[in-house]
């Protein structure tokens, strides 16, 4: 757990020039979500961030190893809180209390948020695809093209990014699709699949892409 404390402190001060994220996945002890969220509310509920923020998600379908994750996101050139923590020990106390409700820390990764189309906070149900791309430039171009073609019929958000550190089983990229809930996601996916020609072009032009996994999550807190 010392690694987590040091890494979170490192992320809060390190800067570079692209939008980015860092995530920490964990398996919560049964029945502890309310206690975990109370701790996080106390830690981040009144935080004033320089850019971006923090999302807490609970996994719903497909990610068997983890129950929740913490996502820190924003502009790494302007990262962290405007309001500083009262002292360094506050991090240690927070992690110690959090660990009382955590069975184990399961996975962490970091990377870039290369695009995020849409801005509707009502869409808190997310499907994540993790893949390995052999041609990142072609993959990004094909993604941008099909998102543009689907924009008139999409109500949620679509995100695209890369993994720079710790991509699951070698994943290089991720794609996120948001919806209001599970049923809304299924209906959205059905509408997307009706666009046969755009999808044909997408698969022909994105380069070799190897599927790794996909899963769904629900945003339970936004800070």
Predicted regions and their residues:
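Generic cytosolic/nucleocytoplasmic N-terminal low-complexity/intrinsically disordered segments
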Residues: 1-2, 192
């Amino acid at each position: 757990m010392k690694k987590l404390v040091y890494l979170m402190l490192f992320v809060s001060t390190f800067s570079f020039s692209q939008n980015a994220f860092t995530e920490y996945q964990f398996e919560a002890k049964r029945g502890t979500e309310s206690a975990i969220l109370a701790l996080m509310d106390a830690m981040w509920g009144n935080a004033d961030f320089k850019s971006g923020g923090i999302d807490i998600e609970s996994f719903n379908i497909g990610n068997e190893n983890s129950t929740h994750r913490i996502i820190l996101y924003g502009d790494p050139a302007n990262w962290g809180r405007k309001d500083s923590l009262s002292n360094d020990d506050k991090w240690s106390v927070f992690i110690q209390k959090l660990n009382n409700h955590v069975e184990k820390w399961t996975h962490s990764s970091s990377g870039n948020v290369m695009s995020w189309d849409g801005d509707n906070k009502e869409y808190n149900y997310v499907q994540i695809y993790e893949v390995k791309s052999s041609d990142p430039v072609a993959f990004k171009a094909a993604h941008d093209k099909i998102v543009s073609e689907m924009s008139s019929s999409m109500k949620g958000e679509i995100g695209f990014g890369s993994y720079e550190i710790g991509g699951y089983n070698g994943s290089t990229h991720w794609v996120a699709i948001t919806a209001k809930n599970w049923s809304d996601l299924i209906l959205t996916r059905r509408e997307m699949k009706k666009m046969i020609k755009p999808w044909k072009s997408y698969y022909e032009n994105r380069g070799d892409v190897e599927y790794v996994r996909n899963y769904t999550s629900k945003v339970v807190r936004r800070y």
